[in-house]
Regions:
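Conserved glycine-rich cofactor-binding loop
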Residues: 20, 27-29
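The beta1-alpha1 cofactor-binding region of Rossmann-like NAD(H)/NADP(H)-dependent oxidoreductases
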Residues: 53, 73-85, 118
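Conserved mid-core segment of classical short-chain dehydrogenase/reductases
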Residues: 83, 106-122, 145, 165-168, ...
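Catalytic Tyr-X3-Lys loop
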Residues: 114-134, 148, 152, 176, ...
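C-terminal substrate-recognition "lid" of short-chain dehydrogenase/reductases
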Residues: 133, 229-258, 263
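Active-site helix of classical SDR
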Residues: 136, 172, 180
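Alpha-helical segment proximal to the catalytic Tyr-Lys
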Residues: 141, 185-189, 249
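Residue(s) in the substrate-gating loop at a strand-loop-helix junction
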Residues: 156
């Protein structure tokens, strides 16, 4: 069915049937959309985020639709919490086939490089870079024990160019691109594929917060997107689902734009 934004809700095809997939940042936005989509595509999903209530609602929804879902508490700024979340997946299912490292935090104060606070930089480093480094290593360790797997990291269109409005956010996302590509090369021999996606403007709570801090940003993003609209979270999740699936078996080390042409 085509909705008012001209997006298409495709019928599931079993893209992830039989796979166990961890999703971070799963309580809202792209992560919540991925939880629903991956489960419909046949994956057993483990959802991780700080908001236990939001995760519980999504788990209930997925199970009501006949899917397999569990939740685990996760604080991306806490390395022990990140490792514990990955360990919990192995406890629940005995393996980990795919990981969608999607959790992130927006920059508290959008603005020029010279006004970005130390606190903002520290938070961006801990959540948008170090957490992924920690998660990827923990995930790869489990995957090696079971013959391999696939990892997808959510970066941003803002990582691909100068970003005066969100300098700390963009810098950490660009660093994430680097370790994504490095992990792809380093772990290929273990049967682990590692890719990233770089979404453009997407209709999420993070964009809502940015709009509140900088009125007019949604209109500017929309105007700069050749397809003429913001992405829906599910559209970003669709790209991640394909990269996690066996249909992307020869794809590793890629940073895939999902931006409506804005980065072209």
């Amino acid at each position: 069915m085509t909705n008012s934004n001209n997006t298409i809700d495709s019928a599931p095809i079993g893209l992830l049937t039989g796979k166990v997939v961890l999703i971070t940042g799963a309580s809202r936005g792209i992560g919540a959309a991925a939880a629903r989509l991956f489960a419909r595509e046949g994956a057993a999903v483990v959802l991780a985020a700080r908001s236990a209530d939001a995760l519980a609602r999504i788990v209930t929804e997925v199970r009501a639709d006949g899917g397999v879902a569990d939740a685990v508490a996760l604080d991306l700024a806490d390395r022990a919490s990140v490792r514990a979340a990955v360990d919990r997946v192995e406890e629940l299912h005995g393996r980990l086939d795919g990981a969608f490292n999607n959790g992130a935090v927006g920059q508290q104060q959008p603005g020029p490089l010279d006004t970005t606070t130390d606190e903002d930089i520290d938070e961006q480093f801990a959540v948008n870079f170090r957490s992924h480094w920690t998660a990827m290593n923990a995930e790869a360790a489990v995957m090696r024990r079971n013959g391999g797997g696939a990892i997808v990291n959510t970066s941003s269109i803002g990582s691909r160019r100068a970003n005066p409005a969100l300098p700390a956010y963009a810098a950490m996302k660009r660093a994430l691109n680097s370790i994504t590509e490095t992990a792809a090369v380093s772990w290929a021999r273990d049967g682990i594929r590692v890719n990233g996606i770089t979404p453009g403007g997407t209709a999420t709570e993070m964009i809502d917060a940015w709009e509140a801090a900088t009125p007019g940003v949604v209109d500017r993003i929309t105007a700069s997107t050749p397809l003429g609209r913001m992405a829906e979270p599910r559209e970003i999740a669709e790209a991640a689902a394909w990269l996690l699936s066996d249909r992307a078996s020869m794809v590793t080390g890629a940073m895939v734009p999902v931006d409506g042409g804005a980065g072209a």
